[in-house]
Amino acid sequence: MSDDYQGTLQQDKIPDEITMTTTNDSPDFTEWQNVLDLIRHASAEQRDELLFQVLLTHDEREALIARVNIVHELLNGERSQRKISELLGVGVATITRGSNELKHQDDDTKAWLANFLAQNKPNQ
């Protein structure tokens, strides 16, 4: 991005009361909780889709969709990891990573997540 474009972007798009100069040599957002807070605030303003479009590339958004489907399928327990891999067009190692993450969760969390995903499936 050219300096001229960046300057124009800052002047034209960001209100003066929001822009600030920082002399700190470290990033402003350093923890996962900071990102979660951003998402919550964007969602409250109904701008979460815009935030995700800016933060994630198309491929990253597709990977997130795949991860949601992986977790959903694993929690359903109706298909083998190999079948899930074939269904979603992802590698078995990707399914295994999702399975390993689920193993770190307690039963209440898994039950909540299974219910949450089942109740929030898009209408088809």
Regions found by a protein language model. Give the residues of each.
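General nucleic-acid-binding
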Residues: M1-A42
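Short, Lys/Arg-enriched anionic-surface-contact patches
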Residues: D48-R67
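Short, amphipathic alpha-helical "recognition" segments used to contact nucleic acids or chromatin
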Residues: L64-R79
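Short alpha-helical "recognition helix" segments of helix-turn-helix
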Residues: R82-G89
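Short, solvent-exposed alpha-helical "recognition" segments
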Residues: S99-L113
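Intrinsically disordered, low-complexity basic tails/linkers immediately adjacent to helix-turn-helix/homeobox/MYB/SANT
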Residues: W112-Q124
